[in-house]
């Protein structure tokens, strides 16, 4: 396999994600129509050169080197394809805010995998890229929907293979995501969780997940209300999110069917009917404002096509 010519450019667009949705801890996630865009360019130099230039929506520019997740993912592609690494530049337009529970790390991993693979004319299958993504991230609930799109349930089977189920999301159910101007790292959110949980809590979550998935499939409001409930992680994580429980209560009082921490937080996901969306959004922002936290709460649609790439120039 030959090294791509200098100047070849690939554009990769990767959606944000909301994970867990309450009871689906570390196994359920949905892609949302908020995106990070990556432009990969083959540049002069050896495989130890990786230039990462990031531009956020607030106009700030940041740089990252070989320690960045994008580069680590690209390295995995080179290793799996038995390819000598080559110099790359990645320019990133950041719309997915980091450390907010919207899968920003997953976008970096997925983009690095797809970009490095595409610039070499895709020697690795999508299945292999999924395997690598889960291995790098350590859990599947963000990277799988980020790559594939839609609502995805991912579990390791008795044969230790990852099994992915594309679940249905009824058109009548809308998502409002309240995104605060505060950060919470996934590692910090995991530290507060117990190593062991009561069997009764595990059983409760299994039942709730079944109700939620059926509610999302059929649009049954009662099933969503009863199923968007968690005993495994949220009871321990709410205390890390300033004003979080007040925001949840405000959303429910404004007509939300259910409310959950998005991923590890601090963003909060509310599911509702379209006609209640504006009230839910305004109530969540106001509740956080009363706790001294600035936020925004946009409507975000479930994105069904996953990550996409295109060749800008070169062969």
Curated annotation (Swiss-Prot):
One of its GO terms (molecular function) is homoserine kinase activity. Keywords: Amino-acid biosynthesis, ATP-binding, Cytoplasm, Kinase, Nucleotide-binding, Threonine biosynthesis, Transferase. It catalyses: L-homoserine + ATP = O-phospho-L-homoserine + ADP + H(+). It comes from the Bacteria. Its main location: cytoplasm. GO terms for biological process: threonine biosynthetic process. Its EC number is 2.7.1.39. ATP binds at residues 97-107. Catalyzes the ATP-dependent phosphorylation of L-homoserine to L-homoserine phosphate. This is Homoserine kinase. It comes from Prochlorococcus marinus (strain MIT 9301). The lineage of its organism: Bacteria, Bacillati, Cyanobacteriota, Cyanophyceae, Synechococcales.
């Amino acid at each position: 396999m030959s090294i791509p010519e200098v100047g070849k450019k690939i554009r990769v667009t990767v959606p944000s994600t909301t994970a867990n949705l309450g009871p689906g801890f570390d196994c359920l996630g949905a892609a949302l129509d908020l995106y990070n865009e990556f432009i990969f360019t083959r540049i002069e130099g050896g495989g130890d050169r990786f230039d990462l230039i990031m531009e956020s929506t607030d106009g700030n520019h940041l740089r990252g080197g070989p320690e960045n997740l994008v580069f680590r993912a690209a390295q995995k592609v080179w290793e799996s394809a038995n390819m000598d690494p080559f110099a790359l530049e990645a320019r990133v337009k950041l719309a997915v805010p980091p450390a907010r529970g919207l899968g920003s790390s997953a976008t970096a991993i997925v983009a690095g995998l797809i970009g490095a693979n595409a610039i070499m004319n895709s020697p690795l299958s999508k299945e292999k890229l999924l395997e690598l993504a889960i291995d790098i991230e350590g859990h599947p609930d963000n990277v799988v929907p980020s790559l594939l799109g839609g609502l995805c349930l991912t579990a390791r089977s008795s044969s230790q293979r990852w099994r992915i189920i594309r679940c249905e999301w009824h058109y009548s159910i809308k998502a409002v995501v309240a995104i605060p101007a505060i950060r919470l790292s996934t590692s910090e959110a995991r530290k507060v969780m117990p190593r062991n949980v009561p069997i009764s809590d595990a059983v409760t979550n299994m039942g709730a997940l079944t109700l939620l998935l059926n509610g999302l499939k059929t649009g049954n409001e009662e099933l969503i209300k009863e199923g968007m409930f968690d005993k495994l992680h949220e009871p321990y994580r709410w205390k890390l999110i300033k004003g979080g429980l007040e925001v949840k209560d405000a959303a429910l009082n404004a007509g939300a069917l259910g409310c959950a921490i998005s991923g590890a937080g601090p963003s909060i996901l509310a599911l509702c009917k379209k006609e209640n969306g504006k009230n839910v959004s305004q109530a969540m922002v106001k509740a956080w404002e009363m706790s001294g936290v600035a936020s925004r709460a946009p409507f975000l649609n479930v994105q069904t096509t996953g990550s996409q790439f295109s060749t800008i120039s070169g062969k």
